[in-house]
Amino acid sequence: MQTPRLNDLALLVARMLLSAIFIKGGWDKAWAYQEAAGYMTKGGVPGSLLPLVIITEFVGGLLILVGWQTRCAAIALAGFTLVAAFFFHWDFGNRGQVIHLYKNIAIAGGFLALFASAAGAYSVDGRRT
């Protein structure tokens, strides 16, 4: 039996899990800037876009974590994740890349579910309603 409290707790845990990979990813790219820029260039994306990628991942992850502007952040990160999947993991000859492709698609699905449900009571958005 689902209760509002259980739903809100599940949304909190979902936000924590979804945000972790983006906060860490943005942080790691900032601290290994040249390596990250090289990886982007190799994938056909200009390295000059790396600051935008870092901000999107790190700030977007923090927004999801605290649950502020959650719907906006969730739809933005869903789109970002799908674009990254197709630029960097669309290689069906490489099993590892295929796994990353489907992982990114699944993460985007999680963000779409978060977009549809909102952040829940245990969030900045939830405290404001």
Give the label of every model feature segment.
Residues 1-31, 38, 47-55, 59, ...:
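Extended, low-polarity transmembrane helix blocks
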Residues 43-44:
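Flexible, solvent-exposed coil segments and beta strand-coil junctions
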